[in-house]
Amino acid sequence: MSKMSSLVSSLILAGSVSVASAWEALPNKAPEPANNPTTPEKVKLGQILYHDPRLSSTGTVSCASCHNTMLGGEDNRPNSMGVNGQTGGRSAPTVWNSAFNEVQFWDGRAASLEDQAAGPVTNPIEMGMKSWDDVVARLKSIEGYQALFEKAFGKDSISKDNATKAIAAYERTLITPNSPYDKYVKGNKNAMTEQQVRGMEKFAEIGCGGCHSGAAFNGPGMFQKFPVFSNGFFNAKYKFVKDKGRAEVTKKESDKNFWKVPTLRNIAITAPYFHNGSVKTLDEAVKIMAKMQLDKDLSKDEIADIVAFLNALTGEFPKQQMPALPATPGTTVN
């Protein structure tokens, strides 16, 4: 047995034992940092900023454009569209339950939701602002934001730091508890179907929980190489290894094709799948993961059972509605 096969076998065994003995329900409240306690005023401001396209250079792209809370927290596109019709090389991850991630972005380059909120605004492809100084100047020019920031942070408080704190505070309210799975592990054994229970058992048995662990099924703070096992057919078809992943951030060869483990919460409604959005169906994604991560060939029935279980991870979504944005009468976005 090769060292890699031995390692994967150990992960499978550890994953199947730990997951089977420690199924966790999703908390109703997300953790928050000491320097940014959640308040209703921050959440209100954050929701408005999140939906305001004027944080982009063209006035056409908001956070919600790619991470739509009216959907599964993303945009169901392989690659999201930013300013001037540009597209990036990665699929937008869901914002729902992102508060349970220890790091953000596919490559983990942001250590917090606050850090993450700062990035897309000045990304030339995504929202295209030249600098946060320009963002702050634009916010200060919109009269309604003065009062909103003052209620959330005090007088003369429009700043990059406070804007990102407000967006993060809003994102920490985007929690989807009470899925059939959550109800099941809390004791309601009728909450999941027999097929979903079989899929849950198979998920643990083959070692999926070696990476997708914890209440959010995201292996909090964990990076994993993908793919572990090379497969010429899948690689040629889906081009998984074209993007170097975390190595793009660290510049370390040892981090090549390593990725933050994504959440499986609400996975049934967040197609397409993988970092490049190349796989259209959940059935195909399960088949690929079993083969390329665990070196397992699953039958159609086993795939169907696991997919049924993953559908049981779709939670209850808090009601969302588009907020009224502060008006800028008589002016345009330049």
What are these regions (language model features)?
Residues 106, 128, 138, 156, ...:
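Short capping loops/turns at secondary-structure boundaries
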Residues 113, 127-128:
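Mobile amphipathic helical/loop "lid" adjacent to a hydrophobic cofactor/ligand pocket
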Residues 23-119, 182-287, 294-296, 321-334:
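Short glycine/threonine-rich turn/loop motifs
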Residues 132-177, 268, 278-334:
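C-terminal capping alpha-helices of c-type cytochrome domains
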Residues 121, 125-126:
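Class I S-adenosyl-L-methionine-dependent methyltransferase module
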Residues 2-20:
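Gram-negative bacterial Sec-dependent N-terminal signal peptides
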Residues 127, 145, 173-176, 180, ...:
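Short His/Asp/Glu-rich catalytic/ion-coordination signatures at enzyme active sites or charged loops
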